[in-house]
């Protein structure tokens, strides 16, 4: 027999090659091997829409007025299978949108609501997202009706925004343009814990110091969006919680005023659910039985819906009128003294010591019954923290100001990961430019590109100087939140001009020349920087025997200091760059893993990463002019020498120091070159070696140049949403 059980009574009569629950994977055998999967996500093999589908074009056929009308109607169309609290789904839809957008973190730009990732694991099954599967299922008839003209990503955020409008808030605006993904994201690190809601301590150097939370995380526990509503590790202490609220919201790009506004505005409507026994709740959607059809947390033992729903375990509404936008949150927060109590589900919550009957919210099903309002530990932080309280008091005194600040903060929360305003679509896009959008003015397109290139070529700047400067300007781009990139030429502004990774002294010299050329020709500095890199690449290709023109589209603008929130760019500072063979310091994560992470953020595939790194090495662009990995005696020529010499068995590779290796002549033992781990991994990893061997072949010299130029142009244009 062949071991597959074919022909054996009682055994599985199918091959096990495609079985998802059995067998041993490569990752099981070699858990520490470099995993390139994060570079191979979201391609045509998983996307059912086909290569010709363009969501931005599909949006042009969307009847936005009709869609919003249908969403308004949905809010009060209660369904028996999941009844609306007080007959209004607004609170549920807002929580869905909040928890989609609120997973964003500034450190790497990942998370957020820009991809519809809440539909997939792990987010669809997070403890903090209990019963949001019901919100998305309630939206399904709307999605079904409008089809491909509206993505799930846009619909989820729009539903939350319309929910606020339906309850009386004048919102700041809304932009369409979020395209869906079709499988779970593999690149986002949510933490190392192996259990939901594991104690916070493992993700902090010291849990008493919120700033010591592990980067890039922005939530206090695995499976939460930001803080534990019952207190740090479930132990109520509003002043302690306030410190963690401040840190987690800062990691979501929010200042103190925005934090108070979002907390209060998010809790002005809706309620918490904990009127029942959490032990009766079934498994999450990913673990639920097939008969649940993608829903989770089902209660088949008791009623489990309406007033008997269990979600967070906390039970009650924050305000007297939970389906109405008003200032009731602050009225109750400051109007009463509060004490700790336990919910029916056993969760800690704050309730008023003594409250007028008319200030109590009514039952979600029977308006003749009233219950105490509640506050979470985070809500009490708004009252007790010495920084948050004055902000909350101002909001209490000035409801119009509160509404405006909240509307703006909600817009920021739900659009922060969309990138610049050029990506916004739809009739409700606000006219006002906001500094967190990293605005860039339009650049000229009517100048003589050939004349600019001629001036650059005659400037005396070397290939390495031109290519390095263009690369440093463009490499900040992150496909996660669409920030960074060459457009705007912010490399000449603080803080980028002073970043160690940009070699400030060298950068200032090169920029001095390029800025002069820009002034003389009418081109933007941003365009001239990119053109400089293109000129360098073309010169290097010519030195290798190939004439090629790097694609270029003029029109980049130059940002100013007034358009730049310098502090917000700190998270974009490169602390490593494998393409320029540089590490700011030693890290616990291996250099090759850091390389993969950066390549993924830049939107590169594995073969694009390979060809770019090999090309950058022979162009002599290493940080500080080091020679590590420069495996050529023709530096400055765009040759395949890096791959030829890396794969040459006439050489041997010996460790010389931490992250430093010597490449020696196998016969004589003479040192020929030095290299780092990110160089040698292209010969040691089986997949990367396969790519390296392609470019080392004798018939691949021209292919290498063509592939390098294509990948280079992709990096230079990654942020050109104005021409996409």
Swiss-Prot record:
Binds 1 heme b (iron(II)-protoporphyrin IX) group per dimer. One of its GO terms (biological process) is hydrogen peroxide catabolic process. It catalyses: H2O2 + AH2 = A + 2 H2O; 2 H2O2 = O2 + 2 H2O. One of its GO terms (molecular function) is metal ion binding. The active site is at residue 99. Its cofactor is heme b. Homodimer or homotetramer. This is Catalase-peroxidase.
